[in-house]
Amino acid sequence: MALLSRIRSSTSLFRHLNASPQIRSLSSASTILSPDSKTPLTSKEKSKAALSLLKSEKDPDRILEICRAASLTPDCRIDRIAFSAAVENLAEKKHFSAVSNLLDGFIENRPDLKSERFAAHAIVLYAQANMLDHSLRVFRDLEKFEISRTVKSLNALLFACLVAKDYKEAKRVYIEMPKMYGIEPDLETYNRMIKVFCESGSASSSYSIVAEMERKGIKPNSSSFGLMISGFYAEDKSDEVGKVLAMMKDRGVNIGVSTYNIRIQSLCKRKKSKEAKALLDGMLSAGMKPNTVTYSHLIHGFCNEDDFEEAKKLFKIMVNRGCKPDSECYFTLIYYLCKGGDFETALSLCKESMEKNWVPSFSIMKSLVNGLAKDSKVEEAKELIGQVKEKFTRNVELWNEVEAALPQ
């Protein structure tokens, strides 16, 4: 699951890096990554600079140049995100040959990247670029690259199928590849397959995966059962959720906060936030301590059902109980409050968020500014624009246009 969280976290990290004065001061690829610079950057500074550039660079040759100059490596989290940004950028513009040049070129020409770890990362990145056939090719050609093939690359290939949402191919890989290459599936392999069945609307098939795991002496963990719970909720099979919870108890698997969070999120996705709130009350009655994730799911759920008062109430309760809202919680609530016309509360939360150096996206901020102006709070709107321009110098012209359109 770690690879998925890395990819999903890239958008949030981009936002924080763009707000950094250090990154804003870096002007171009030639000065950022030049080896002849009088003040050479550290490896970490190069990675941050590369990530900032890769977001917006349009020339495929320049994207490859930036990646090579930064000497990116999968050992570093920010480098993994930079790789993902480069591939995503190239794929969006349909520069698929450039994606191959980047990933295959690194495996073939960088001795430090001739490893199963980078190959596994490349397998997933190809799927991210909608090039699953290349993911399969890399897996098959590992010997050609003089890279050993273990369960790690098998799991990466299954994850690539999940990224591509090619569930039929995932099932084929699971059935054929372990036998073909003499690979013994592990816990992660089985959890990947549970996710495949649950995402493809066949959550009941996950029972057979659990049975196979146990036949081979591998114990399902809370993640295994959590995936099943999420899958059954998505299919509106609450009775099956009860069965899974009973299985957890029978096997001594703790039903902790993470399991409750999965249940709460699943119910909120199905617009059953009141039912999810009842689970929160049950947690508190049982002496369990909900965390930031618990409240964030509920806040998002009630916002999505246009119950903004309950969402605001939960936000206050969350803070009062010592749970610190993260940036996404702020952004979600600000977005929905603007949508619901509560610009005063949205402004207050926006100021809190910006004090923590968390600035919502341009579209959210523009919605808030225009809403304040409609509420005859033009000065507050202009003040907010001024603060945002300090954080995002690259958007100054856009904000000047927004400000010029405000009532005078």
UniProtKB/Swiss-Prot annotation:
<keyword id="KW-0677">Repeat</keyword>
<dbReference type="GO" id="GO:0003723">
    <property type="term" value="F:RNA binding"/>
</dbReference>
<feature type="repeat" description="PPR 6">
    <location>
        <begin position="291"/>
        <end position="325"/>
    </location>
</feature>
<dbReference type="GO" id="GO:0005739">
    <property type="term" value="C:mitochondrion"/>
</dbReference>
<feature type="repeat" description="PPR 2">
    <location>
        <begin position="150"/>
        <end position="185"/>
    </location>
</feature>
<feature type="repeat" description="PPR 3">
    <location>
        <begin position="186"/>
        <end position="220"/>
    </location>
</feature>
<keyword id="KW-0547">Nucleotide-binding</keyword>
<feature type="repeat" description="PPR 8">
    <location>
        <begin position="361"/>
        <end position="391"/>
    </location>
</feature>
<keyword id="KW-0496">Mitochondrion</keyword>
<dbReference type="GO" id="GO:1990904">
    <property type="term" value="C:ribonucleoprotein complex"/>
</dbReference>
<keyword id="KW-0809">Transit peptide</keyword>
<dbReference type="GO" id="GO:0000166">
    <property type="term" value="F:nucleotide binding"/>
</dbReference>
<protein>
    <recommendedName>
        <fullName>Small ribosomal subunit protein mS86 (rPPR1)</fullName>
    </recommendedName>
</protein>
<feature type="repeat" description="PPR 5">
    <location>
        <begin position="256"/>
        <end position="290"/>
    </location>
</feature>
<dbReference type="GO" id="GO:0005743">
    <property type="term" value="C:mitochondrial inner membrane"/>
</dbReference>
<keyword id="KW-0694">RNA-binding</keyword>
<dbReference type="Pfam" id="PF13041">
    <property type="entry name" value="PPR_2"/>
</dbReference>
<feature type="repeat" description="PPR 7">
    <location>
        <begin position="326"/>
        <end position="360"/>
    </location>
</feature>
<keyword id="KW-0687">Ribonucleoprotein</keyword>
<dbReference type="InterPro" id="IPR002885">
    <property type="entry name" value="Pentatricopeptide_rpt"/>
</dbReference>
<dbReference type="InterPro" id="IPR050667">
    <property type="entry name" value="PPR-containing_protein"/>
</dbReference>
<keyword id="KW-0689">Ribosomal protein</keyword>
<keyword id="KW-0472">Membrane</keyword>
<comment type="function">
    <text>May be involved in translation through its association with polysomes. Could bind RNA.</text>
</comment>
<dbReference type="InterPro" id="IPR011990">
    <property type="entry name" value="TPR-like_helical_dom_sf"/>
</dbReference>
<comment type="subunit">
    <text>Component of the mitochondrial ribosome small subunit.</text>
</comment>
<keyword id="KW-0999">Mitochondrion inner membrane</keyword>
<feature type="repeat" description="PPR 1">
    <location>
        <begin position="115"/>
        <end position="149"/>
    </location>
</feature>
<comment type="similarity">
    <text>Belongs to the PPR family. P subfamily.</text>
</comment>
<dbReference type="GO" id="GO:0005840">
    <property type="term" value="C:ribosome"/>
</dbReference>
<dbReference type="Pfam" id="PF01535">
    <property type="entry name" value="PPR"/>
</dbReference>
<feature type="repeat" description="PPR 4">
    <location>
        <begin position="221"/>
        <end position="255"/>
    </location>
</feature>
<feature type="transit peptide" description="Mitochondrion">
    <location>
        <begin position="1"/>
        <end position="26"/>
    </location>
</feature>
